Amino acid sequence: MSIKHFNFFVSVRLTLRVLSLVCVMVLFGCSSSSMEFCVDSGECELAVNVLKVAGDIPIDPSDSFWKNINQVHPQIVELNPQMITNPKWPNPSVKSVNILGVQNESELGLLLEWSDSSLENKIEISATHTDQAALMFPLYPGKELPAITMGSENEIVNIWQWRAIWEPSISSKSRGNNRSSKALIAGSIHRSPVEDLTAAGYSTLTTQDEQNVSGRGVWEEKTWRVVFKRSLENTDSADVQFQHSIVMAIAVWNGDNRERNGQKGISNWILLRLP
């Protein structure tokens, strides 16, 4: 190859690379209907393909619906140590989760599944150190990806957080005849074990006035299976709208390992690819 041809080849490669970077910066400039750029650019670790289904999406993770869907191989998502902010957590006990996504004409359902050898169901402990899982979405997906540390002032995120202690079956078993346990749970009855929140960085987690996410978790055979469900679109300006494919992140806390707040395992951004 001559010097002239080599220089031309390098110039073309640089031009393509610049165009790719521009694509990433403007997000939808090169893909008006999705966020596929994050996979191509390496900003997303992997993609989860959501399956289109007919009929209702059950909230019970033990429903045969999910067992049949499980015939479609779930995506394995690795969870990383949280080493960005204090208290850092170099060794989270949950290293990975399986995720399945389904969508009908009006709703999105996501099933998380991970191994957990112990169910922490002592209410006195679980009030602060309970098994938990959360999904995080950028509120404005047309902008650059938010910081993985729960967004920032200009990059607000919508978070769905499930807590085992809010599961009615677990709460009732945990209380028993212990008066102090009853006192702890009094006035803390939740309509759903999943809370709809927003955040603009660490220590800014805020409960929304409107709670639009439902869910349920079941612990069987040393495994948690948790369903999150919400309408694809709504009128709440604090909620993410699922009009197109979008990025998301996953976090898991193991109460038995004394994990809470920033002490968790967290994924990188992944693409939730809608049908």
State the predicted function of each range.
Residues 61, 107-114, 224-230:
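Short, well-ordered beta-strand segments enriched in hydrophobic/aromatic residues
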Residues 215-222, 238-242:
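Exposed beta-sheet edge/beta-hairpin loop segments within beta-rich domains
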Residues 116-123, 236:
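Short amphipathic, basic-aromatic surface patches that mediate peripheral association
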Residues 27-29:
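C-terminal motif of bacterial Sec signal peptides marking the signal peptidase cleavage site
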Residues 170-218:
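Short helix-loop boundary/capping segments
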Residues 14-21:
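Sec-dependent signal peptide recognition
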Residues 31-71, 125-186, 234-275:
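Acidic/polar low-complexity flexible segments
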Residues 1-12:
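N-terminal secretory signal peptides that target proteins for export/translocation
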